[in-house]
Each structure stands twice: as C-alpha cells, then as structure tokens.
C-alpha cells in the first residue's frame, strides 16, 4: 500500500526541470529549498494525494484506470488516467510530462520526465 506520509529528502534537477515546464524563476527560487510533505490515502483503487510545500497545498483524487482531473505543478488542471504497474508503481501522463511514483520499502521515488528533462524527488516515510 502507498498509504502514509512522506517527507522530501532530496531532489535532482529541480531548477532545470521547472524552467523547462515554464514555472517562473521567482517560484523556482522559492520552492527549491522547501521540504514538502506528501500524504497518500489509499482505499483499494481510490487515492487521495496531498502535497504540502510551505503554504502551497496540491490535492488530487483519482481512481486507478479511470479518467480524473488532476492539478499539475504549474496549477493547470489536466484530465488523465493514473495506472498501476506491478505492486509498487503509479504512472500518469500529464500534458507531455510522464510521472512515475515508485514505492520501495519506506522510500517514495517520484520521477517526472518531459522530453530530455528529468526531475527526481526522493521522500521517506515519516
């Protein structure tokens, strides 16, 4: 189960990736050192994911395999389908960005890819 709270431990390529997806420099500078906390609630195939970064809260609810409206890092709402691969991987495509969330023990690894740009977030269960 993905359920739990996870605190960001490290991230790779944050600034370059955020620039590539069009986030303004001011927001990139504000966000680069903030430790975000992700909370995942899971009930069978239904998920609620809340990511709190400072005062910004990003909340998405979805059911695996069904279309849902998801909010992206840039605040846009995009209709997409989250799929599960194996026991420990969630995959979704949001407007050209592929997001893979993988659970390995108490470590949650989220990799976002757009073209040649990749951004990786590593969080630990708290």
UniProtKB/Swiss-Prot annotation:
Pfam hit, one: Lipocalin_7
Subcellular location, record wording: Cytoplasm
Major place of residence: cytoplasm
Any one cellular-component term (Gene Ontology): cytoplasm
Keyword line: Cytoplasm, Lipid-binding, Transport
SUPFAM superfamilies per record: Lipocalins
MF terms (GO), sorted A to Z: lipid binding
Family: Belongs to the calycin superfamily. Fatty-acid binding protein (FABP) family.
UniProt function note: Binds free fatty acids and their coenzyme A derivatives, bilirubin, and some other small molecules in the cytoplasm. May be involved in intracellular lipid transport. The specificity of axolotl L-FABP differs from that of LB-FABP.
Free-text note on domains in this protein's UniProt record: Forms a beta-barrel structure that accommodates hydrophobic ligands in its interior.
Name of the protein in question: Fatty acid-binding protein 1, liver
Species, as recorded: Ambystoma mexicanum (Axolotl)
